[in-house]
Amino acid sequence: MAAMTVQLDIVSAESSIFSGLVAHLQVSGAEGDLGVMPGHAPLLTHIKPGMARIVKQDGKEEVFYLSGGILEVQPFSVSVLADVVLRAEEIDEQAAVEAKRRAEAHMANAGADFNYAAAAIELAQAIAQLRVVETIKKNIAR
């Protein structure tokens, strides 16, 4: 018996990052983590900066970092549209650590003209990238 799958397309502002059949997708939605499997109800929602984990048709997993964006679920296809999409192995861990440190410093030393929203977004994106790196390291250690 063939595994049930759904067509998934992950697209960044620059290019198509992934297109193929998947058995499962997990993303960080605006209201919490979302799991999408074949037969999922139609849905359109914002996604937060975080990890997208897919289980492909052959059972292999792949992990991506998404900067946030839109998730659209239709009966036979799922689309993820994000400004920035990185495969887990493309994440520069040191750059993410530095971005996190920088955002925390800006928030701690905020002046009158401080843009809190921009610093919060930078911090959330850096933390999300570091979580993806940690997840990959845990999977490799198994």
Curated annotation (Swiss-Prot):
Gene Ontology terms for molecular function = ATP binding; proton-transporting ATP synthase activity, rotational mechanism
Task: State which residue ranges cross the membrane.
Answer: none
User: How does the protein's chain sit in the membrane according to the entry?
Assistant: Peripheral membrane protein
| Location(s) in or outside the cell | Cell inner membrane
Record-level GO cellular component terms: plasma membrane; proton-transporting ATP synthase complex
Q: What domain of life does the UniProt record list for this protein's source?
A: Bacteria
Entries under SUPFAM superfamilies matching the protein = Epsilon subunit of F1F0-ATP synthase C-terminal domain, Epsilon subunit of F1F0-ATP synthase N-terminal domain
- Alphabetical list of InterPro entries matching this protein: ATP_F1_dsu/esu_C_sf, ATP_synth_F1_dsu/esu, ATP_synth_F1_dsu/esu_N, ATP_synth_F1_esu_C, ATPsynth_dsu/esu_N
What functional role does this protein have?
Produces ATP from ADP in the presence of a proton gradient across the membrane.
The similarity annotation says: Belongs to the ATPase epsilon chain family.
UniProt xrefs under NCBIfam families: ATP_synt_epsi, PRK00571.1-4
PANTHER family associated with the record: ATP SYNTHASE DELTA/EPSILON CHAIN (PTHR13822), ATP SYNTHASE EPSILON CHAIN, CHLOROPLASTIC (PTHR13822:SF10)
User: What quaternary arrangement does the UniProt entry report?
Assistant: F-type ATPases have 2 components, CF(1) - the catalytic core - and CF(0) - the membrane proton channel. CF(1) has five subunits: alpha(3), beta(3), gamma(1), delta(1), epsilon(1). CF(0) has three main subunits: a, b and c.
Protein's name in the database = ATP synthase epsilon chain
Q: To which species is this protein native?
A: Shewanella loihica (strain ATCC BAA-1088 / PV-4)
* Encoding gene (name): atpC
